[in-house]
């Protein structure tokens, strides 16, 4: 299709998605094909320039994503970096992930979308995205288009050479960013190994490496964060993956920050959400927000299993 025509169609899709109306199956298919072409050119450590606004988990809470854009500025007026977990748990995974992918295809230089541990075939079959696709489309094709696309998402991003962003955390198999650049990311998230760790690990109060209670990834202490940041010339590791009640949380003597962008997570946790604005000098400020007002929540019968780690 002619590029100008496609852009026009894309703008119509974005307009529709902004009203929380899903695209057709064939539209999702062509959107995902276009997104693959763009993402395949991105690095495992995708370089991002400031100013940029960094966001954590969204988890299908579409109306709260709209609130995030209201607080942080619309795309493409504001540059965004999302650190994964677009789907599962919330009621609107389909609309949420479709909108973010559409914005990526439309404004590729202005938005970066990383892979979270929920951008996986296995996890989405348990925590809601698969069932939601079946409910909204009557078959699993849309789930397949998206989960195939997830394999192409970059694993990490580097803002101005100094702030390292990723979904989960560090890995005992990775000392340098070059180690990450050398990984083959075009695959389902493995059960173990460096790629798994980047999407599953958590910072911990105890030093060194520890066994993760999640059953994947590791816990890592302040000594590990400091060593990693120093070795790679970094000032900060920015990550998501954990519910924090204020929406953001410093740890490891400000070597690591956790950002969580799904307010009142699972519609019941009572937490605030936050995003981190980095200005052109890399000064950061946090914007906190509460859930968007909702009219008439859909009633979902099947309760998905809980894990709040």
From Swiss-Prot:
Cofactor list: Mn(2+); Fe(3+); Zn(2+)
Active site: 118
Entries under Gene3D superfamilies matching the protein: 3.60.21.10
UniProt KW keywords: Centromere, Chromosome, Cytoplasm, Cytoskeleton, Hydrolase, Iron, Manganese, Meiosis, Metal-binding, Methylation, Nucleus, Phosphoprotein, Protein phosphatase, Ubl conjugation, Zinc
Gene Ontology biological process terms, A to Z: cardiac ventricle development; cellular response to calcium ion; cellular response to cytokine stimulus; cellular response to ethanol; cellular response to follicle-stimulating hormone stimulus; cellular response to glucose stimulus; cellular response to insulin stimulus; cellular response to steroid hormone stimulus
Annotated positions binding Zn(2+): 57, 59, 85
Modified residues (Phosphotyrosine): 307
Binding of Fe(3+), residues: 85, 117, 167, 241
Enzyme Commission number(s) from the entry: 3.1.3.16
Post-translational modification Leucine methyl ester, affected residues: 309
Post-translational modification: Reversibly methyl esterified on Leu-309 by leucine carboxyl methyltransferase 1 (Lcmt1) and protein phosphatase methylesterase 1 (Ppme1). Carboxyl methylation influences the affinity of the catalytic subunit for the different regulatory subunits, thereby modulating the PP2A holoenzyme's substrate specificity, enzyme activity and cellular localization.
Annotated cofactor note: Binds 2 metal ions per subunit. Can be two manganese ions, or one iron ion and one zinc ion.
Gene Ontology cellular component annotations, sorted alphabetically: chromatin; chromosome, centromeric region; cytoplasm; cytosol; FAR/SIN/STRIPAK complex; INTAC complex; membrane raft; nucleus
Regulation: Inhibited by the interaction between PPP2R2A and ARPP19; this inhibition is enhanced when ARPP19 is phosphorylated. Inhibited by the interaction between PPP2R2A and PABIR1/FAM122A.
Compartment list: Cytoplasm; Nucleus; Chromosome; Chromosome, Centromere
PROSITE patterns in the record: SER_THR_PHOSPHATASE (PS00125)
Molecular function per GO: beta-2 adrenergic receptor binding; enzyme binding; GABA receptor binding; identical protein binding; metal ion binding; phosphoprotein phosphatase activity; protein antigen binding; protein domain specific binding
Binding of Mn(2+) 2, residues: 85, 117, 167, 241
Predominant place of localization: cytoplasm
Catalytic activity reported: O-phospho-L-seryl-[protein] + H2O = L-seryl-[protein] + phosphate; O-phospho-L-threonyl-[protein] + H2O = L-threonyl-[protein] + phosphate
EC class (word): hydrolase
Description of how the protein assembles with itself and partners: PP2A consists of a common heterodimeric core enzyme composed of PPP2CA, a 36 kDa catalytic subunit (subunit C), and PPP2R1A, a 65 kDa constant regulatory subunit (PR65 or subunit A), that associates with a variety of regulatory subunits. Proteins that associate with the core dimer include three families of regulatory subunits B (the R2/B/PR55/B55, R3/B''/PR72/PR130/PR59 and R5/B'/B56 families), the 48 kDa variable regulatory subunit, viral proteins, and cell signaling molecules. Interacts with the PP2A A subunit PPP2R1A. Interacts with the regulatory subunit PPP2R2A.
Similarity comment text for this entry: Belongs to the PPP phosphatase family. PP-1 subfamily.
Protein purpose: Catalytic subunit of protein phosphatase 2A (PP2A), a serine/threonine phosphatase involved in the regulation of a wide variety of enzymes, signal transduction pathways, and cellular events. PP2A is the major phosphatase for microtubule-associated proteins (MAPs). PP2A can modulate the activity of phosphorylase B kinase casein kinase 2, mitogen-stimulated S6 kinase, and MAP-2 kinase. Cooperates with SGO2 to protect centromeric cohesin from separase-mediated cleavage in oocytes specifically during meiosis I. Can dephosphorylate various proteins, such as AXIN1, p53/TP53, PIM3, WEE1.
Entry protein name: Serine/threonine-protein phosphatase 2A catalytic subunit alpha isoform
Species this protein is from: Rattus norvegicus
